[in-house]
């Protein structure tokens, strides 16, 4: 069952301007250490940051909160599964909200799609609730 959908379009030029103007202050306020490390290694760091910014906005929309109700930028981070597929790792208020919207007996799975075509970066997030796997004790 789908419990949340969000999308966002980010202007890479706007993210570049924020990086130029605010530098580390912007990077550390909005992005996790993993996101900063990954983006800083890219030839086009601004595009990488813009995709991650769009992912956070899309995830906040899928959670139904936006950037309020205890959900902060660094509570959501883009990470990659072993396959390389991107997903979101949630902590703090974002994780609490995910737990609130996940029905009992279900496990939330976050699906993330990222793309960019200068000057835009785009992200789609779908939060799906699937039946929880039975525990070994059952």
Swiss-Prot record:
Its cofactor is Mg(2+). It is found in: Cytoplasm. Keywords: Cytoplasm, Fatty acid biosynthesis, Fatty acid metabolism, Lipid biosynthesis, Lipid metabolism, Magnesium, Metal-binding, Transferase. InterPro entries: 4-PPantetheinyl_Trfase_dom (IPR008278), 4-PPantetheinyl_Trfase_dom_sf (IPR037143), ACPS (IPR002582), Ppantetheine-prot_Trfase_dom (IPR004568). The keyword Metal-binding applies. The keyword Ribosomal protein does not apply. GO terms for biological process: fatty acid biosynthetic process. GO terms for cellular component: cytoplasm. Its EC number is 2.7.8.7. It holds the Pfam family ACPS. GO terms for molecular function: holo-[acyl-carrier-protein] synthase activity; magnesium ion binding. Mg(2+) binds at residues 8, 57. It catalyses: apo-[ACP] + CoA = holo-[ACP] + adenosine 3',5'-bisphosphate + H(+). Transfers the 4'-phosphopantetheine moiety from coenzyme A to a Ser of acyl-carrier-protein. Belongs to the P-Pant transferase superfamily. AcpS family. HAMAP family: AcpS. NCBIfam families: acpS, pantethn_trn. This is Holo-[acyl-carrier-protein] synthase. It comes from Phenylobacterium zucineum (strain HLK1).
């Amino acid at each position: 069952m789908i419990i949340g959908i969000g999308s966002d379009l980010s202007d890479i030029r706007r993210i570049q301007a924020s990086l130029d103007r605010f530098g580390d202050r912007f990077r550390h306020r909005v992005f996790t250490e993993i996101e900063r490390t990954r983006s800083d290694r890219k030839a086009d760091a601004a595009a990488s940051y813009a995709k991650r910014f769009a992912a956070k906005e899309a995830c906040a929309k899928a959670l139904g909160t936006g950037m309020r109700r205890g959900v902060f930028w660094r509570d959501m981070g883009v990470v990659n599964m072993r396959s390389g597929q991107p997903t979101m790792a949630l902590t703090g208020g974002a994780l609490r909200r995910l737990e609130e919207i996940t029905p009992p007996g279900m496990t939330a799975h976050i699906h993330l799609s990222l793309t960019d075509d200068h000057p835009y970066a785009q992200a789609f997030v779908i939060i799906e609730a699937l039946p929880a796997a039975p525990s070994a004790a059952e």
